[in-house]
Swiss-Prot record:
A GO-annotated cellular component: membrane
Topology in membrane: Single-pass membrane protein
Protein name stated in the entry: Abscisic acid 8'-hydroxylase 2
Organism expressing this protein natively: Oryza sativa subsp. indica
Cofactor: heme
Pathway info: Plant hormone degradation; abscisic acid degradation
Domain of life: Eukaryota
């Protein structure tokens, strides 16, 4: 009976909420579509092509119930085992082609990226802002991407290390004391603070910072809700908070203009950037375009990074010998900095070899971004199969990361595997191609600094079960990994006595 009630609940939820939401994204594509558009030899060639193997499930709903009634990763893995590395399905009313090989991922994201466009539900675009760079292709996207990449390049990040370090120190200090707290929630606060520093530098006042934090949290809570504008719903509250974010950001921009300059941070770059008009005219980005891209960067910088940080704490906690080795590496830097009296430097973060391997393995194991959505803009042939125009195409990053053909014993947490670089296109934690995450180096810097501060000054203990996974929407240990954190005395004397300290230059 309990199972029946659960099944009815899931079915009702999908039919009443999830399906309508996603149908806003999906165009109606007939199951048996006419692939003979055009004429001559092209028509004859397409006529011979076949759709990939797979099941389309029930009308409209497709295989959505199967997906949501189990771990999504198990669903995709079972499909790959049955049909191979390219298969079709229907999810939330949309026909999809799933691709689970490095070659296919490269085909969609890099070599033939022009044939596939990013696709998001309209409700998501409204929430973040339609001018955010990851909703676009072409010149506008490339120009903004270059701007963001410049703000997050090594030369720029070098100057951000003290700010990131200060944000990490403040987060851990607020968490410490032995009380139980959600690791994920603490890491979300940290990632938000790092995002704010990256966008605004050190120029943002406390009032604006707290207003941004308050309203952004409301937007975030409504982001994955059914887009119901009825007053009182989470979605309606999120839309109102998004309007307030626009007003706050316009006020910040106006204050900077009044001071006569934009500054050398990301916001300053956006304020100086110009938009190529359709008639060839060039104008500065509008306040709406600036606001959309600021919210977009905050969105991209928070939950994904916070999820990985949460997994890093779990993996280190569950691997005591590895934790001691990481601690030895970090204590060498800590002692070289006179017990933390001198600031951590960019050069030192580049010397954290084992810690960097731990981060890469955490990215692989957790595979926070399990897949990405694209849409075919034309009929596409791939390995003798037809990918029809309008179908969704999903490179399955997690399936690639957990394939024993590319990573031996893939379910084992083994950072040493990254002593050797992975084969091309087999490790895609930040995507690939022109839409790959431009903030990947910032995210890794945040992770390195957190591990340094954590293992040299704190100890932590996981409270309760931590093996189950929940999706919010990214995978994290259930409950966000409840844990206690304590400040501990520095251990540099012990490490020096053991002879494990080596010179670590600044």
């Amino acid at each position: 009976m309990a199972f029946l009630l659960f099944f009815v609940f899931v079915t009702a939820a999908v039919l009443c909420f999830v399906v309508p939401a996603f149908l806003l994204l999906c165009t109606s594509v007939q199951r048996r579509r006419d692939v003979g558009q055009g004429g001559g030899r092209d028509w004859q060639k397409k006529k011979k092509l076949r759709l990939p193997p797979g099941s389309m499930g029930w009308p409209y709903v497709g295989e959505t119930l199967q997906l949501y009634s189990q771990d999504p990763n198990v669903f995709f893995a079972s499909k790959q085992k049955r049909y191979g590395e390219i298969f079709k399905t229907n999810l939330l009313g949309c026909p999809c082609v799933m691709l689970a090989s490095p070659e296919a991922a490269r085909f969609v994201l890099v070599s033939q990226a022009r044939l596939f466009k990013p696709t998001y539900p309209p409700s998501k675009e409204r929430m973040i802002g339609p001018s955010a760079l990851f909703f676009h292709q072409g010149e506008y996207h490339l120009r903004l991407r270059r701007l963001v990449q410049a703000a997050l390049a090594p030369d720029s990040l070098r100057a951000l290390v003290p700010d990131v370090d200060a944000a990490v120190a403040a987060t851990l200090a607020a968490w410490s004391g032995g009380h139980v707290a959600s690791t994920f929630h603490a890491m979300k606060k940290l990632s938000f603070d790092v995002g704010v520093v990256t966008i605004f530098g050190g120029r943002l006042g406390r009032r604006h910072r707290e207003e941004l934090r308050t309203n952004y949290s409301v937007v975030e809570r409504g982001y994955n809700c059914f887009p119901n504008r009825f007053p009182g719903t989470l979605y309606h509250k999120a839309i109102q908070a998004r309007k307030r974010l626009r007003a706050i950001l316009s006020e910040i921009v106006a204050e900077r203009r009044a001071r006569g300059g934009g500054g050398d941070d990301l916001l300053g770059g956006l304020m100086r950037s110009r938009d190529d008009g359709t008639a060839g005219a060039v104008a500065l980005l509008t306040d709406d375009q600036i606001a959309d891209n600021v919210v977009g960067v905050l969105f991209a910088a928070q939950d994904t990074t916070a999820s990985v940080l949460t997994w890093i704490l779990k993996y280190l906690h569950d691997s005591p010998k590895l934790l001691e080795a990481v601690k030895a590496e970090q204590m060498a830097i800590y002692v070289a900095n006179e017990g933390g009296k001198r600031p951590l430097t960019w050069t030192q973060t580049r010397s954290m070899t084992l810690t960097h391997q731990v981060i890469l393995e955490s990215l692989r194991m957790a595979s926070i971004i399990s897949f990405t959505f694209r849409e075919a803009v034309a009929d596409v042939e791939y390995k003798g199969f037809l990918i029809p125009k309008g179908w969704k195409v999903m490179p399955l990053f997690r399936n690639i990361h957990h394939n024993p053909d590319y990573f031996q014993d893939p379910q084992k947490f083994d950072p040493s595997r990254f002593k050797v670089a992975p084969r091309p296109s087999t490790f895609l934690p930040f995507g690939s191609g022109v839409h790959a995450c431009p903030g990947n180096e910032l995210a890794k810097l945040e992770m390195l600094v957190l591990v340094h501060r954590l293992v040299t000054a704190y100890r932590w203990e996981i409270v309760g079960a931590s093996d189950e996974v929940e999706y919010s929407p990214f995978p994290v240990p259930r409950g966000g990994l409840n844990a206690k954190l304590w400040k501990q005395e520095a251990e540099e004397d012990m490490y020096m006595a053991m002879g494990t300290i080596t010179a670590a230059g600044a």
